[in-house]
Design a protein with these regions (language model features):
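Extended, Lys/Arg-rich, non-catalytic nucleic-acid recognition/anchoring regions
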Residues: 180-182
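C-type cytochrome heme-c attachment and multiheme electron-transfer modules
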Residues: 2-58, 65-70, 74-178, 200-204, ...
Length: 547
């Protein structure tokens, strides 16, 4: 029997392969799910994504039929199959890791990407530099540090380990829903642009600082409606981060984080009024601007929030607004000589126009008798009109090498478990000091008592660093503090709570707070900023800040 020629065998194999391929293609073409028509945006671009996601509802400017899906979420808008269409997709276009390919491309918001990355909300430069300086790891508090540099380098130290584990959820490089098992409130922080510019659609629960859920925000992304992309940022988005440290977000809406007693009790049970982290709170006087219906963005400008492209060291450098921007004869100009876009003259009177609701707020001039009194020339507006401020005394910080804790930048648990506690917290009689030749309000910021525990459970080190920091409390009231409250209060003057006594022509002060026993010995009283002879007892948050 003769064998068939090799060429014949090759041709047969080729024909078999060709028929198999054709069969596969025919099968795929007859079984693939095709949209009834090609989807095209109003700009004329083919966007097959809309064929599947036609029911997604967005705001008008970002509607799918206008923008499509791929300009924001990337992927392949020409593909028909889900697998091909979703290749290279990003869940959050606002993430600063991808923003240059999404939100910040030409035709959308091209200048914002680089600006936001240099903003203090993204870099945390002031927080990092000041922490390192306070803890003796830097020569000054103006160093060029950033969250991005920490993520790229992996750099750590005692101070940076503390930041990574207890502080690093309030910056724009944080990803949304990146903290397994953490409450939803913490998972909703961060996300770059979407940290501020997205909200849940109407009908969906919108989380606030006092109505947070205890579930984890990263357990299920299915069946979650697409958030709305908004320009008019609600105050709830700001307060996601601005509810610790200076607590200005809480103070503005009249919330004071109280002691952990849970008083006043309700029905023999601790108070139900709690903040994330199981913190109790009291409702007291909110800021007069909040009473009038104003939100954060009504005052704060785009450049000072999102940055203007300059790598500022501290927020007072990035800040543009001041009280006189509104309350002066010719309002509407910032400290950096820029015009704001929501102050207008109506019927002969200046008004501020709310950016969310369009409400007109009349701008009153300062009281000539009190505010313009010659003796008050150096007194800042908030020194009189901020009637309360959160004062967190004694920050007890412990690091235990025997336990691990989640590093919020790497999302990995590493050795060293940090715990914080305080001596006490108060709100009354804001203390005054002098900064940049102006009388300002100060509050503890921070009064660190640091202790480290080694692997054997022994104390391996520790130090104290007490600092008073200038603050704009965001608790403005129409009626200012009384003369007595400033001129006859030892606490307001920086001495602390106590009694002033004159004997034999000499003045003496007897403080209520006697200080703490620490590894470095007895401290000064926590609310004692200065002696009656004018000697500073604690550091100032800036070199030129003094009692």
């Amino acid at each position: 029997m003769t064998r068939p020629p090799g060429k014949l065998i090759g041709a047969f194999v080729f024909l078999l392969l060709a028929m198999t391929l054709i069969g596969y293609l025919v099968f795929r073409e007859t079984t693939i799910k095709r949209p009834p028509q090609i989807s095209v945006t109003t700009a004329g671009y083919v966007e097959m994504c809309v064929s599947c996601h036609a029911k997604v509802k967005l705001d008008t400017a970002h509607a799918a039929n206008v923008v499509g899906c791929s300009p924001c979420h990337l992927g392949n808008p020409l593909a028909i199959s889900k697998k091909e269409a979703h290749k290279g997709m990003v869940l959050n276009p606002g993430d600063l890791r991808v923003v240059d390919k999404t939100c910040a491309v030409a035709g959308c918001h091209p200048t914002y990407g680089s600006r936001v990355k240099k903003s203090l909300m993204a870099t945390n430069r002031g927080i990092l530099a000041t922490l390192l300086y306070y803890w003796g790891e830097a020569d000054n508090q103006n160093g060029d540090y950033s969250v991005k540099k920490l993520m790229d380098s992996g750099r750590t130290s005692l101070a940076l380990d503390y930041y990574r584990k207890l502080c690093a959820t309030c910056h724009l490089w944080k990803k949304k829903n990146d903290l397994p098992g953490y409450p939803k409130f913490f998972n909703e922080k961060g996300g770059g642009c979407t940290a501020c510019h997205d909200v849940q659609p109407k009908g969906e629960p919108r989380m606030t600082i006092t109505s947070f859920a205890g579930d984890s925000g990263n357990d299920s992304k299915k069946n979650r409606p697409h958030p709305l992309i908004i320009k008019k940022v609600p105050e709830a988005n700001c307060i996601r981060c601005h509810n610790r440290s200076g607590r200005i977000g809480l103070s503005y809406i009249g919330i004071f984080e109280s002691e952990g007693y849970g008083t006043p009790y309700q029905g023999c049970e601790p108070s139900p009024h709690r903040l994330p982290g199981n913190r109790f709170y009291l409702k007291i006087a909110d800021d007069v601007h909040h009473k009038k219906g104003m939100v954060c963005i009504d005052c704060h400008t785009q450049n000072e929030i999102m940055g203007d492209g300059t790598n500022y060291a501290h927020y007072e450098d990035q800040l543009e607004i001041s009280c006189v921007m509104c309350h002066s004869k010719n309002p509407g100009t910032t400290r950096k000589n820029k015009k704001v876009n929501n102050i207008e003259k109506k019927n002969g009177h200046f008004v501020l126009i709310g950016k969310i609701d369009g409400r007109q707020h009349p701008l009153d001039l300062p009281n000539k008798t009190v505010c313009l009194y010659p003796g008050h020339k150096r007194v800042s507006c908030e020194a009189c009109h901020s009637t309360w401020v959160p004062q967190c005394y004694g920050c007890h910080v412990k690091r235990d090498e025997r336990e691990t804790q989640l590093d919020k930048l790497t999302i990995k648990a590493t050795a060293g478990w940090w715990q914080e506690g305080r001596s006490y917290i108060r709100y009354e009689k804001p203390m005054l000091a002098v900064w940049r030749n102006r009388v300002v309000i100060v509050t503890p910021g921070c009064q660190d008592v640091v202790t480290t525990i080694d692997k054997n459970g022994h104390i391996s080190g520790g130090f104290n660093r007490f600092t008073m920091a200038a603050i704009s409390p965001h608790t403005t009231q129409a009626k200012g503090r009384s003369c007595k409250d400033c001129h006859a209060s030892p606490k307001t003057l920086g001495l602390g709570e106590g009694t002033v006594v004159e004997k034999n022509g000499k003045w003496r002060f007897f403080p209520v707070d006697k200080g703490l026993n620490t590894l470095e010995g007895r401290t000064v009283g926590l609310d004692n900023f200065v002696t009656i002879d004018g000697k500073p007892l604690q550091h100032g948050s800036r070199k030129d800040l003094r009692p």
